[in-house]
Amino acid sequence: VNWKIMWGAASAVLLWALWYGWYQYGGDISYGRLNKIPFQEIQWYHAMAPGLLLILTRVGVPVSTSFLVLSAFASTFVLEKMLMKSMMGYAVAAVAAYVIWIGVSKILDEAKPVKESHKIYWRVGQWFTTGFLWWTWLSHDMANIAVFLPREIPVDMMLIISAVFVFGLWYMFREGGGKIQNIVLEKHNTRYVRSATIIDGVYWIILFFFKELNDIPMSTTWVFVGLLCGRELAMATVTGKEKFKVVFPLIGKDFLKMMVGLAASVGVVLSIHYIIVPNGL
């Protein structure tokens, strides 16, 4: 599919998520995720998090945007709650993916060519699951941008935000996802339509569950890495083609990169709370 078509579809879902959240939550586009993080006037040290995020993402580290950005604004109490919810998300995703792909691997060869008569169903399924996943993901991670904005955003500012977001998507699709895309592409059979559809569907359901659980922000990155971890272990268990000595280093590398991102987040929050503005939050 041409990247411009995907950009148009993604932009449509994004604009729906943005304006629906704004209308439903009284001008707050965070979907209530910032209820425990009051608005603060932007200070110079708040730029540390986006700066680190840009650097780590460019080198392919699957850093948690929620931890890195919100840690500069949240209290240590809220950060602890975010960490616990994200750890639970990682564990739930890994276990669910393992169980699901044990079953899927027994009845479906994801790498086998799709029958011509079935292709339309898988394509529709992929667009459907990806669209709902995109909306659910936005309802989680919109808070990472909304934290810099007033909790009640006026219409004129919303129009500017919408334009900036759509332009950002245009750049991202034109670049093809960048180095961070390798986290997915290096996994077993993730390029196939059936694999992508099932991954998107499972990821969507898990994120939706945690969205409805409570309004504490969480790392959607951790959930995704946990899902890929469980899937890789399941496929190695069932097929026997992937030796565990090959799978474990792959999983370990992703987990290590996650810890690098977490360490950066902790560094930001400790610097702000105990060095730059001690007792300020």
Specify the residue positions occupied by each region the protein language model found.
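Multi-pass alpha-helical transmembrane bundle typical of ion/small-solute transporters
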Residues: 1-281
